[in-house]
């Protein structure tokens, strides 16, 4: 692949991912309008912040500027979403505990553990990459309960088709990017992201929506951080 095509792929992947991250802004806008988070969970925001923070660390270690850029933006956005959720949730104490746990994990792994391997750069990259994959794969598990509901109901109207299609394209872009730079830690989670998106898209064929609403997912839960 030519340098121009490579730059085009990395640039479009970053732009697509940022637009995907911005889906959380629509959720937060509703919180602000209603002055309440209702019964929605703040966990996706916290997980998004954790995932982007890990990938930011990984990008810095591997000196991949595209990874660094997209995750600086992602971690900033998810931190803002987290703060907005905190302002409007009634269960602040539980939410603070969840966020404190995530910060503890982030500090323990990124700051303490990996810095002990400062003289073993390859091992530090490997360990950070493993944590990135684990967090991202766990984030992929968020929509699975809805998929089971769709299968039981034999109706895909609760799935947001445009967002799923976008997720597939974003995962595919990063998968190709990971293949080009021979990075299995980028390839693996995005390969799984492609599979999950294709599974969801196939449900529209197997179980056609009786009346499409596309509101079954909270948008941010589908915006898998990378």
From Swiss-Prot:
Gene3D superfamilies: 1.20.1280.290. Its main location: Golgi. One of its GO terms (cellular component) is Golgi membrane. One of its GO terms (molecular function) is sugar transmembrane transporter activity. Keywords: Cell membrane, Golgi apparatus, Membrane, Repeat, Sugar transport, Transmembrane, Transmembrane helix, Transport. It comes from the Eukaryota. Residues 8-92, 129-210 form the MtN3/slv domain. GO terms for biological process: salivary gland development. The chain crosses the membrane at residues 8-28, 42-62, 67-87, 94-114, 127-147, 161-181, 185-205. It is a multi-pass membrane protein. Pfam families: MtN3_slv (PF03083). It is found in: Golgi apparatus membrane; Cell membrane. Belongs to the SWEET sugar transporter family. PANTHER family: RAG1-ACTIVATING PROTEIN 1, SUGAR TRANSPORTER SWEET1. Mediates both low-affinity uptake and efflux of sugar across the membrane. This is Sugar transporter SWEET1. It comes from Drosophila pseudoobscura pseudoobscura.
